[in-house]
């Protein structure tokens, strides 16, 4: 029997306030991680200016990716029809909050900053998540699978191109990659729909644009 999503038991104003707070926390706040930073015990070896600039650009991309993931998952969860689906999305979002905090910490260590366009990234991802969720929970889960698979691929790219001595960034990205793969597997097991071919392609193009811009801004 399908269970009603808990969000549907709250008033529209309650739901609006919850979503607004989530957006503010993600974009402007500094939400704490529930798990220890994977780089905590890894030596912070000094990078030269070019290595530091490149590492910061990559970690800014990863931070934006987590902002987008939060927007996507919260948008999907807001319109989820089934309580189990909503729980899955919010649980994944919590792990993405850990990633967000770890990437923010590493950016600070690299004397850099998050993307100036984070409000735009979040808003666009939230809208996409809500639209996907309105098509049905299977569509919503399908977007989770495709998103996480594409994130896995760009994490692999970053692990290849990070400076060899930047082991702190590498430690963070390795754990993130494990988490993303698990999120995709869990979404598939929960009944994700395979998305029509044009959608993954469009998502890949949007991701490429985001990475190009976020590396600098």
From Swiss-Prot:
Pathway: Cofactor biosynthesis; ubiquinone biosynthesis. The keyword Cell membrane applies. It is found in: Cell membrane. It is a peripheral membrane protein. Keywords: Cell membrane, Iron, Membrane, Metal-binding, Monooxygenase, Oxidoreductase, Ubiquinone biosynthesis. Fe cation 2 binds at residues 96, 148, 180, 183. Its main location: membrane. One of its GO terms (cellular component) is plasma membrane. It is an enzyme of class 1 (oxidoreductase). InterPro entries: COQ7_proteobact, Ferritin-like, Ferritin-like_SF, Ubq_synth_Coq7. GO terms for biological process: ubiquinone biosynthetic process. Its EC number is 1.14.99.60. Pfam families: COQ7 (PF03232). One of its GO terms (molecular function) is metal ion binding. Binds 2 iron ions per subunit. It comes from the Bacteria. Its cofactor is Fe cation. It catalyses: a 5-methoxy-2-methyl-3-(all-trans-polyprenyl)benzene-1,4-diol + AH2 + O2 = a 3-demethylubiquinol + A + H2O. Fe cation 1 binds at residues 66, 96, 99, 180. PANTHER family: 5-DEMETHOXYUBIQUINONE HYDROXYLASE, MITOCHONDRIAL, COENZYME Q10 BIOSYNTHESIS PROTEIN 7. Belongs to the COQ7 family. Catalyzes the hydroxylation of 2-nonaprenyl-3-methyl-6-methoxy-1,4-benzoquinol during ubiquinone biosynthesis. This is 3-demethoxyubiquinol 3-hydroxylase. The lineage of its organism: Bacteria, Pseudomonadati, Pseudomonadota, Gammaproteobacteria, Lysobacterales.
């Amino acid at each position: 029997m399908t269970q009603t999503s808990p969000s549907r038991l709250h008033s529209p104003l309650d739901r609006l306030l919850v979503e607004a707070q989530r957006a503010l926390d993600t974009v402007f706040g500094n939400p704490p991680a529930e798990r220890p930073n994977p780089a905590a015990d890894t030596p912070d070896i000094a990078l030269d200016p070019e290595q530091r600039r490149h590492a910061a650009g990559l970690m800014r991309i990863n931070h934006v990716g987590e902002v987008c993931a939060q927007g996507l998952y919260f948008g999907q969860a807001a319109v989820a029809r089934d309580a189990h689906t909503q729980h899955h999305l919010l649980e994944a979002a919590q792990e993405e909050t850990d990633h967000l905090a770890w990437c923010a910490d590493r950016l600070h260590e690299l004397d850099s900053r998050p993307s100036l366009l984070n409000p735009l990234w979040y808003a666009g991802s939230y809208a996409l998540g809500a639209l996907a969720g309105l098509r049905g929970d299977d569509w919503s889960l399908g977007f989770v699978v495709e998103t996480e698979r594409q994130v896995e691929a760009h994490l692999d790219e970053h692990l290849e191109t990070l400076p060899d001595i930047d082991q702190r960034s590498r430690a963070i990205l390795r754990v993130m990659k494990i988490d993303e793969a698990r999120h995709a597997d869990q979404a598939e097991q929960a009944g994700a729909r395979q998305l029509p071919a044009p959608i993954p392609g469009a998502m890949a193009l949007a991701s490429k644009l985001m990475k190009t811009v976020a590396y600098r801004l």
